[in-house]
């Protein structure tokens, strides 16, 4: 959803809820069901709010309603209004990924930059080592291109190596679907090493997605959140190359628990970059 003069106050209220201390997504949803809108939630009394979500979360809502986070809210809203590529999806938006909601991992808001209509398509997540070898990079490019040409969105985390190679493959596809990248930073602060690739992605009609405010920097906490979202974002996840104890293995296992189809590309038994993918195959990955 693009932000304009008509909807900016509603968006402002949603961002305030997102920034309320001690209020998680489930609590926000309960409040929205009881009060009917983000505006009404922010107008609620402390006692009424506390009856629904408890006192700590209620105090967080009252604080943002009184302006506690206005600087951050204003900065986010200014970015959304000034950049025509930028948008926002509330958890109530029809374009909000259903897989995230069903997984129980959904943040209240997703910030976007680029072509939001890609979220209507089926997606396949491709992930793997940031320090991949040549074979791994070739495989990632191959599958990125093939999946794009099959009419699906290639979704990757904002990392070098396998994810970047998969994006390059999708961008090289003949009449393919542009790829999407899930960021650990805000959409206005993409990783420097990926600047050129992400510019090409946006120019080709791709999409950047983040659970962080547009100007937010990447942090350990935001990477953990981003990795959790990867597990629930799509119904298919492919691990191209990963070390034995790589974090992506936990993401793949979580995706399998959520009902996603998980695949892994096997590699040589002496290749340390293949041991993680080989382990997933032994556990039942396709």
Predicted regions and their residues:
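Short, small/acidic-rich helices and loops at N termini and domain boundaries
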Residues: 1-92, 280-283
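Glycine-biased, small-residue-rich flexible motifs in mid-sequence functional cores and linkers
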Residues: 1-10, 91-286
């Amino acid at each position: 959803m693009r932000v304009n003069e008509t909807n900016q106050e509603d968006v402002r209220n949603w961002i305030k809820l997102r920034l309320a201390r001690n209020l998680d997504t489930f609590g926000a949803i309960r409040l929205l069901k009881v009060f009917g809108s983000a505006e009404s939630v922010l107008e609620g009394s402390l006692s009424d709010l506390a009856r629904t979500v408890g006192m700590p979360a209620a105090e967080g809502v009252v604080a943002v309603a009184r302006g506690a986070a206005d600087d951050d809210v204003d900065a986010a809203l200014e970015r959304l209004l000034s950049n025509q590529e930028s948008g926002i999806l509330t958890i109530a938006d029809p374009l909000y990924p259903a897989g995230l909601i069903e997984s129980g991992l959904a943040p209240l808001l997703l910030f976007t930059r680029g072509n939001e209509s890609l979220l209507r398509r089926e997606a396949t997540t491709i992930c793997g080592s940031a320090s991949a070898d040549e074979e791994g990079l070739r495989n990632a490019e191959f599958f990125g291109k093939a999946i794009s040409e099959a009419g699906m969105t290639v979704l990757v985390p904002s990392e070098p190596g396998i994810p970047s190679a998969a994006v390059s493959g999708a961008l090289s596809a003949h009449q393919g679907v542009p790829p999407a990248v899930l960021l650990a930073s805000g959409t206005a602060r993409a990783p420097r090493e990926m600047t050129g690739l992400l510019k090409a992605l946006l120019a080709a009609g791709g999409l950047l997605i983040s659970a962080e405010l547009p100007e937010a920097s990447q942090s350990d906490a935001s990477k953990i959140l981003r990795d959790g979202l990867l597990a629930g974002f799509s119904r298919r996840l492919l691990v191209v190359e990963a070390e034995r104890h790589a974090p992506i293995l936990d993401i793949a296992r979580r995706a399998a628990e959520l009902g996603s189809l998980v695949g892994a590309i096997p590699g040589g038994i002496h290749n340390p970059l293949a041991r993680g993918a080989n382990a997933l195959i032994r556990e039942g990955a396709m």
